[in-house]
Amino acid sequence: IMQTPGLIVKSIPEYDRISGWQVQAQNDGLLTDAAGDSYDFLFYESMTERTLFDREEGFYISAQNRTAQWEEILSAYGFSGQEISDFIEFWDAKLEKEDYIMYPQYTETVDEAMPVEIIPAPEHLIRMWFGFELYDGQQYQEAEILPFDRTGYTVVEWGGMIF
């Protein structure tokens, strides 16, 4: 898996700036590298250009009810139970206990921000980041949820950023 190496600032496992991540995916999603180490997912933090991201359509996420809201939204998109749990664990710790607008960013936008090459190419590549912006009464349009197609060899990436 190759991404734009200059943009990656942190990764697990370590991202090789020449060859990328060299992992083999099993049918159950487990990833194994050449050393035999296994991973449930690949993690990275990156520097990205915020102006690429849409802030027109989103979801109001209340501080008091965000876990249930995230579960409902992510489930409707088609994220797995484990992906939803990982998302909640990661973002609940990162965000202040405030209300947010959560703006979905789809594969095309994420590809612009952080290009990726996967060999062999998956049948379905689902890359979804969410932009989080503190809610202060700003106008937004409710985002429409279009469930993904996860049939066959599918790669799913989720992530986000705080605006």
Q: Residue ranges of each PLM-predicted region?
A:
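Protease-labile, long low-complexity intrinsically disordered regions enriched in Pro/Ser/Thr
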Residues: 1-163
